[in-house]
Curated annotation (Swiss-Prot):
<keyword id="KW-0408">Iron</keyword>
<dbReference type="InterPro" id="IPR027443">
    <property type="entry name" value="IPNS-like_sf"/>
</dbReference>
<dbReference type="InterPro" id="IPR005123">
    <property type="entry name" value="Oxoglu/Fe-dep_dioxygenase_dom"/>
</dbReference>
<keyword id="KW-0847">Vitamin C</keyword>
<feature type="binding site">
    <location>
        <position position="223"/>
    </location>
    <ligand>
        <name>Fe cation</name>
    </ligand>
</feature>
<dbReference type="GO" id="GO:0045431">
    <property type="term" value="F:flavonol synthase activity"/>
</dbReference>
<comment type="similarity">
    <text>Belongs to the iron/ascorbate-dependent oxidoreductase family.</text>
</comment>
<dbReference type="GO" id="GO:0045486">
    <property type="term" value="F:flavanone 3-dioxygenase activity"/>
</dbReference>
<comment type="pathway">
    <text>Secondary metabolite biosynthesis; flavonoid biosynthesis.</text>
</comment>
<comment type="function">
    <text>Catalyzes the formation of flavonols from dihydroflavonols. It can act on dihydrokaempferol to produce kaempferol, on dihydroquercetin to produce quercitin and on dihydromyricetin to produce myricetin.</text>
</comment>
<keyword id="KW-0223">Dioxygenase</keyword>
<feature type="domain" description="Fe2OG dioxygenase">
    <location>
        <begin position="196"/>
        <end position="296"/>
    </location>
</feature>
<feature type="binding site">
    <location>
        <position position="277"/>
    </location>
    <ligand>
        <name>Fe cation</name>
    </ligand>
</feature>
<dbReference type="GO" id="GO:0005737">
    <property type="term" value="C:cytoplasm"/>
</dbReference>
<protein>
    <recommendedName>
        <fullName>Flavonol synthase/flavanone 3-hydroxylase</fullName>
        <ecNumber>1.14.11.9</ecNumber>
        <ecNumber>1.14.20.6</ecNumber>
    </recommendedName>
</protein>
<feature type="binding site">
    <location>
        <position position="221"/>
    </location>
    <ligand>
        <name>Fe cation</name>
    </ligand>
</feature>
<dbReference type="GO" id="GO:0046872">
    <property type="term" value="F:metal ion binding"/>
</dbReference>
Length: 335
């Protein structure tokens, strides 16, 4: 089956100034009518190199309770490596279409890895204005290089180096999030899969859209991961639902955007909140982002941490295998 990519649709749409009907959101979702433009609080920005650990733990815990999202600076990933990550990803999406299709996700695949466009339509038959590439970058046992682009030639080395630095940042985040719950530093990481946690990289490619007022790059959702660590490009688009309204996330060069995902919300028994977010698109510019989803291995059972549950704080979530949670979420079934 030949799948039409959004990149190709965008080229056609650009010439006639319209977009196909399946990309036009219902009015209650359209960015033009639902984005809040008044004075709004900003997503917290946290210096990960703060020498006062108590203050750092407090800031991260507060942001995770109140927002479910924060940006981190001074995280230790070299800015030139982030630039390279962005450059090789952009180069891949600028390759001829037939070269990209070599990496396309097999139609019968149970896994999300590969190049693609969201195949399943949403509940109302709508589509998102985005193409993507998924592949795992860690641990080595989970990597399938069949889905790693061979062009540009530096793609593999850059992504492997990025994964190496990313692991250090992730370990710090898990430690501070654990301490913020009043449990020992290693608890959350261990409960989410320990050293077997899978790092799933996704590159989102949102081409210019002639009607950004009507379309969305990604519909409102929470991430099914434990944590998501995201690098955006300079084109704004990430929006967060806070205080009953959609507000724009500010772009901070070289910062990492950290999303609390569903699994951390479950492990924390609701103390930390998975962030509801969506992506808007731009009329003239291509937006791209590089989230890494930190996911428990498929058979890991995730439920509220026993240290956080007692008679006064009963469990708010069922414990279940991550693969079962994912299946329910992706198929829009109740948990």
């Amino acid at each position: 089956m030949e799948v039409e990519r959004v990149q190709a649709i965008a080229s056609l749409s650009h010439s006639n100034g319209t977009i196909p009907a399946e990309f036009i959101r219902p009015e209650k979702e359209q960015p033009a009518s639902t984005t809040y433009h008044g004075p709004a609080p900003e997503i917290p920005t946290i210096d990960l190199d703060d020498p006062v650990q108590d203050r750092l733990v407090r800031s991260i815990a507060e942001a995770s309770r109140e927002w479910g999202i924060f940006q981190v600076t001074n995280h230790g990933i070299p800015s030139d490596l982030i630039c390279k990550l962005q450059a090789v990803g952009k180069e891949f999406f600028e390759l001829p279409q037939e070269e990209k299709e070599v990496y396309s996700r097999p139609a019968d695949a149970k896994d999300v890895q590969g190049y693609g466009t969201k195949l399943q339509k949403e509940v109302e038959g709508k589509k998102s204005w985005v193409d993507h590439l998924f592949h795992r970058v860690w641990p080595p046992s989970s990597i399938n290089y069949r889905f790693w682009p061979k062009n540009p030639p530096s793609y593999r080395a850059v992504n492997e180096e990025y994964a190496k630095y990313m692991r250090e940042v992730v370990d710090k985040l898990f430690t501070y999030l654990s301490l913020g719950l009043g449990v020992e530093g290693g608890v959350l990481k261990e409960a989410a899969g320990g050293d077997d946690i899978e790092y799933m990289l996704k590159i989102n490619y949102y081409p210019p859209c002639p009607r950004p007022d009507l379309a969305l790059g990604v519909v409102a959702h929470t991430d099914l991961s434990a944590l998501t660590v995201l690098v955006p490009n300079e084109v704004p688009g990430l929006q967060v639902f806070k205080d009953d309204r959609w507000i724009d996330a500010k772009y901070i060069p070289n910062a990492l955007v950290i999303h609390i995902g569903d699994q951390i919300e479950i492990l924390s028994n609701g103390k930390y909140k998975a962030v509801l977010h969506r992506t808007t698109v731009n009329k003239d510019k291509t937006r791209m982002s590089w989230p890494v989803f930190l996911e428990p291995p498929a058979d890991t059972v995730v439920g509220p941490l026993p240290q956080l549950v007692d008679d006064e704080n009963p469990p708010k979530y069922k414990a279940k295998k991550f693969k079962d949670y994912s299946y329910c979420k992706l198929n829009k079934l109740p948990q």
